[in-house]
């Protein structure tokens, strides 16, 4: 099961509820894993901290948008812009940090292209 968290606080869902409460609802269910998606990598660190206290495997698929908060107003993805500061090296570093904190599922969401995933794969398998 995947959740979207606030950009400013990865412990809160975009709708305002606590991530921890949502995870608790499904921790004893047949759901295989917990994921965070469509949030900036920096916000997901606090989500990873929350997910570590539950029994299911977990991970994250961050996006590379400047912000998705504008969707709350305009509800139109065409207004979203790609970040210029999230290069491949920084993305891979963020993913390795998640893995170091026990995430077993990592990848990318919007604006994270194949070259990012290829670099992540190479880093995981070559080190």
Model-derived features: positions:
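Domain-level signal for soluble alpha/beta catalytic cores
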Residues: 1-127
């Amino acid at each position: 099961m995947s959740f979207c968290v606030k950009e400013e606080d990865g412990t809160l869902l975009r709708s305002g509820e606590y991530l921890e409460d949502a995870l608790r609802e499904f921790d004893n269910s047949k759901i295989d894993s917990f994921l965070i998606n469509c949030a900036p990598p920096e916000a997901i660190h606090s989500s990873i901290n929350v997910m570590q206290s539950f029994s299911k495997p977990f991970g994250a698929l961050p996006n590379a948008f400047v912000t998705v908060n504008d969707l709350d107003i305009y509800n139109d993805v065409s207004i979203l812009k790609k970040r210029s500061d999230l290069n491949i090296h920084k993305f891979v570093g963020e993913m390795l940090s998640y893995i170091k904190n026990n995430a077993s599922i990592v990848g990318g969401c919007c604006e994270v292209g194949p070259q990012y995933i290829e670099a992540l794969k190479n880093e995981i398998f070559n080190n």
